[in-house]
Amino acid sequence: PGWTLRVVSNKLPALRIEGDLNREGEGIYDKMNGIGAHEVVIETPRHTETLVTMPLKGVENVLRAYRDRIVDLKQDQRLRYVLVFKNHGVAAGASLEHSHSQIIALPIVPKRVTEEIEGAKTYFHYKDRCVFCDIIRQELQQKHRMITENKY
């Protein structure tokens, strides 16, 4: 088909890149326009191929595409948070059967994300250790929830 991976605007975007935020207060509430980015990463031209079945180089291309899109979206001063997510199958909410993922860039950092970051900072302040490193160490040691392990 002449391509290995494509990134396109979502046909039914939750947010639009064009326009101004027009952030303003309305009483105790704040409001703004639905500005942001909503993109679809088409991970392969082959309809039946998935991240699990594609060659390592294909997975590498997908991860590089995520990185490149995040770097580009960070250039837009209106955007504060980028989320990459993947739904697989109708039961998970995917509207396309073809292997794809999505990228959403928001003008705000979601409250839950801010709370998790603050919690990680507090943990580090009290223990002088990274909470995520401690979680990984514990999971590797206990192996209760581990599915597989490799050198990566």
Protein language model regions, located:
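HIT superfamily nucleotide-processing domains
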Residues: 1-152
